[in-house]
């Protein structure tokens, strides 16, 4: 476009700015003042002469025309792209309808007492409140930091439901394969599914208007790790849940929010519309359970920390010395506990000696050094060896982004292509081609962001 002041150029910049804010920063909307400011920066970046630059008035005038013609949606002082506004508006409407739909409160006292005896558990007042609330409303939320007994509450809810409805159907879901497997293991239920699998979705926002919606056939749906759910996935979830299905959303509001746009869990908690039970008593009280306490202190803004067997602070003057000490600690712990039970976390991927990529290479040379060319494969500037600890970085049908495993073998097929055998636990023993290794990283060390929702017995952070 030759005319740098044309309405078409300004329109394109406005829409680009909104999409950039969504995809890079997770914003569903921008305040009008911010949108004008960011759009001007984009429009005027290639114009060095101040007198020739686009003025704020021009952007504001074009914005008004875009709002009039539906190219941008204005809600109060906030501006949305029509697609994103539709997602939020649709989700809010479905939640409001669910809350307005009077759910029959069930008397659970007899069932709850029976469950206490069968599971051999004693529930705190807050835990009992969470269980009761789940059977009094169509939509409820349970939150709490690590160690506050969320899993015990889920077990109790499931058992009370089975006691009340022997032929009833319930479904457990979580955003990732890793979280769903952990949910099934911790509750003792045969199956928990990913949201995408349970809802019949792909891995992205490719659901068309005419595509058939698969409804979830369940009387009770429990979703764990709901803080990871973005606005698009929340819309797809509520679209597929029947109005008479009880829904329990569970999560830690202090965990990192969803990668996609929209902080749905936080907004639901603070809306004042959804019944919320906050579990705030830490039950892990052993001398080896200090991490849960320290996480609570940090969330509360306290500088107090407990130190002991499972929480140690090691002072180090430089990154080089830090990297050396991390390697020494890792090798000692891995020798005692096994590599699968030790994990290094770093806030950086590439920057500095203590970044995860540098630590991965250094650690690997100590715990899994070169043996023979037959036992390693080079992909670009990366090398993988038999016995390497690895992490999957992209969701597939069998493994999820963040899943950890080991390389168990490297072979060559009849065409001379190198194939890598991976073991991610259970029946997930897979063979990778060189192309598929693009979505695999060494995982002796990883970034704190990548590690969100993973577990290891020992962590060097």
Regions found by a protein language model. Give the residues of each.
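Conserved helicase motor core of SF1/SF2 NTP-dependent helicases
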Residues: 141, 152, 156, 160, ...
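N-terminal pre-P-loop "Q-motif" helix
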Residues: 121-133
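Accessory, non-ATPase domains that flank or precede helicase/AAA+ motor cores in DNA-metabolism machines
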Residues: 1-107
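Conserved helicase motor core of P-loop NTPases
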Residues: 133, 250-398, 408-410
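Pre-Walker A (Motif I) flank of P-loop NTPase domains
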Residues: 136-140
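Conserved small/polar residues in nucleotide/adenosyl-binding loops
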Residues: 452, 456-459
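The conserved Walker
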Residues: 146
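Conserved glycine(s) of the Walker
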Residues: 149
């Amino acid at each position: 476009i030759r005319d740098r002041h044309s309405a078409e150029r300004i329109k394109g910049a406005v829409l680009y700015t909104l999409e950039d804010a969504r995809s890079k920063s997770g914003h569903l909307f921008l305040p009008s003042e911010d949108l004008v400011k960011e759009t001007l920066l984009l429009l005027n970046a290639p114009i060095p002469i101040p007198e020739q630059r686009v003025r704020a008035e021009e952007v504001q005038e074009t914005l008004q025309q875009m709002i009039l013609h539906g190219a941008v949606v204005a809600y109060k002082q906030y501006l949305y792209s029509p697609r994103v506004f539709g997602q939020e508006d649709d989700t809010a409407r479905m939640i409001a309808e669910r809350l307005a739909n009077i759910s029959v409160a069930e008397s659970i006292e007899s069932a709850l007492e029976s469950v206490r005896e069968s599971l051999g558990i004693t529930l705190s007042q807050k835990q009992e409140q969470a269980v009761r609330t789940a059977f009094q409303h169509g939509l409820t939320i349970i939150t709490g930091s690590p160690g506050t007994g969320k899993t015990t509450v889920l077990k109790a809810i499931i058992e009370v439901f089975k006691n009340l409805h022997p032929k009833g159907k319930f479904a457990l879901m979580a955003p990732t394969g890793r979280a769903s497997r952990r949910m099934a293991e911790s509750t003792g239920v045969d199956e928990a599914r990913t949201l995408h699998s349970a809802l019949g979705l792909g891995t992205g926002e490719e659901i068309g208007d005419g595509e058939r919606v698969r409804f979830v056939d369940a009387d009770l749906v429990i979703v764990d790790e709901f803080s990871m759910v973005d606005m698009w996935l929340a819309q797809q979830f509520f679209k597929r849940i029947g109005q008479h299905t009880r829904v329990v959303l569970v999560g830690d509001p202090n965990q990192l929010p969803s990668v996609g746009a929209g902080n749905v869990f936080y907004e639901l908690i603070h809306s004042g519309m959804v019944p919320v039970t906050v579990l705030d008593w830490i039950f892990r009280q052993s001398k080896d359970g200090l991490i849960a306490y320290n996480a609570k202190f940090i969330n509360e803004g306290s500088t107090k920390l407990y130190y002991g067997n499972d929480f140690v602070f090691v002072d180090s003057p430089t990154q080089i010395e830090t990297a050396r000490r991390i390697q020494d600690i890792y090798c000692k712990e891995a020798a005692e506990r096994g590599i699968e039970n030790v994990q290094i976390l770093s806030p950086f991927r590439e920057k500095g000696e203590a970044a995860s990529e540098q630590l991965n290479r250094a650690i690997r040379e100590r715990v899994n050094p070169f043996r023979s060319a037959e036992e390693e494969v080079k992909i670009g500037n990366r090398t993988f060896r038999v016995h390497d600890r690895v992490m999957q970085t992209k969701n597939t049908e069998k493994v999820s982004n963040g899943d950890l495993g080991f390389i168990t073998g490297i072979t060559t097929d009849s065409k001379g292509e190198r194939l890598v055998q991976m073991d991610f636990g259970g029946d997930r023993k897979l063979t990778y081609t060189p192309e598929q290794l693009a979505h695999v990283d060494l995982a002796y060390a990883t970034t704190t962001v990548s590690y969100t929702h993973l577990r290891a017995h020992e962590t060097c952070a």
